[in-house]
């Protein structure tokens, strides 16, 4: 009886140790891996402070992206309220940032983006408001962030307007 008890104990000790090994140090074969859907293309925009911001500034960071415009009266205020909640949860994460791109760069100048960021009380070290050339902003929205179907692109950039309720 002693040998049988010892064998059972040994079996369960090995089983528990094996379980903990695979749980904490072993392969992550059981973890779900997210597929890469798109890569960010090279770009350069201006922040609310007039500083350049490029795709290289996003390297190694988890980034939440949105498109909005400062004089929007429909979905944008609600989106930015939701974005404030996201920011509150992740603001202390060292590799987290939010990028709010304008979809109306003719009106949303650097100065206007600064006023808007200040009105939200945004911490602009980790939540940046970006403006730039309309064709560049829209190209990145479609090709990198997948916020709009590239088939929606019209011949004239002046006739285009991306206004979406989605975050990327």
Model-inferred region functions:
Residues 80-140:
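Structural microenvironment flanking redox-active thiols in thiol-disulfide oxidoreductases
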Residues 53-83, 99:
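Short active-site neighborhood of thiol/selenol oxidoreductases, capturing the structured segment around
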Residues 134-168:
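Thiol/disulfide oxidoreductase modules built on the thioredoxin-like
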Residues 46-47, 168:
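Hydrophobic alpha-helical segments, especially N-terminal targeting/anchoring helices
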Residues 1-46:
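N-terminal targeting signals for export/organelle localization
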């Amino acid at each position: 009886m002693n040998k049988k008890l010892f064998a059972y104990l040994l079996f369960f000790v090995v089983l528990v140790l094996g379980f903990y090994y695979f749980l904490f140090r072993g392969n992550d074969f059981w973890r779900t891996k997210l597929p890469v859907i798109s890569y960010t293309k090279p770009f350069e925009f201006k922040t609310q402070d007039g500083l350049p911001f490029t795709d290289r500034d996003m390297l190694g960071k988890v980034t939440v992206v949105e498109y909005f415009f400062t004089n929007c009266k429909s979905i944008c205020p609600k989106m930015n309220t939701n974005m404030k909640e996201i920011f509150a949860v992740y603001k202390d994460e060292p590799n987290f940032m939010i990028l709010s791109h304008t979809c109306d760069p003719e009106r949303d100048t650097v100065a206007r983006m600064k006023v808007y960021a200040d009105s939200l009380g945004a911490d602009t070290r980790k939540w940046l408001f970006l403006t730039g050339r309309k064709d560049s902003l829209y190209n990145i929205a479609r090709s990198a962030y997948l916020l709009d179907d590239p088939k929606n692109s019209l011949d004239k950039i002046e006739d285009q307007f991306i206004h979406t309720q989605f975050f990327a």
